[in-house]
Amino acid sequence: MKKFIALLFFILLLSGCGVNSQKSQGEDVSPDSNIETKEGTYVGLADTHTIEVTVDNEPVSLDITEESTSDLDKFNSGDKVTITYEKNDEGQLLLKDIERAN
């Protein structure tokens, strides 16, 4: 009987050491895989939540977040900038960072 209880205890102990590999809600599958950095020319605000930057002679619209909105006041149309953005699952370009190009 003692061996049976010891065996049962050992099995329970090992089952508690298992690893749960389920993805938690909101966790990215591949972080930073869709983030790009490019240089371009700042055009300006397209609307209250979008800026336009010309990259490789093509206009690019980027959705801005509350964090990136505060930085936009220091840029004028025609400024050379370096943008870091992420392309989400819907194909939208989300601005992560904008800086003056050197």
From Swiss-Prot:
GO CC annotation terms, alphabetical: plasma membrane
Induction comment from the UniProt entry of this chain: Repressed by LytR.
Membrane-protein topology: Lipid-anchor
Keywords, alphabetical: Cell membrane, Lipoprotein, Membrane, Palmitate, Signal
Keyword Membrane: yes
Lipidated sites in chain (S-diacylglycerol cysteine): C17
UniProt function note: Possible role in the secretion of LytB and LytC.
Protein name: Membrane-bound protein LytA
Species for this entry: Bacillus subtilis (strain 168)
Gene: lytA
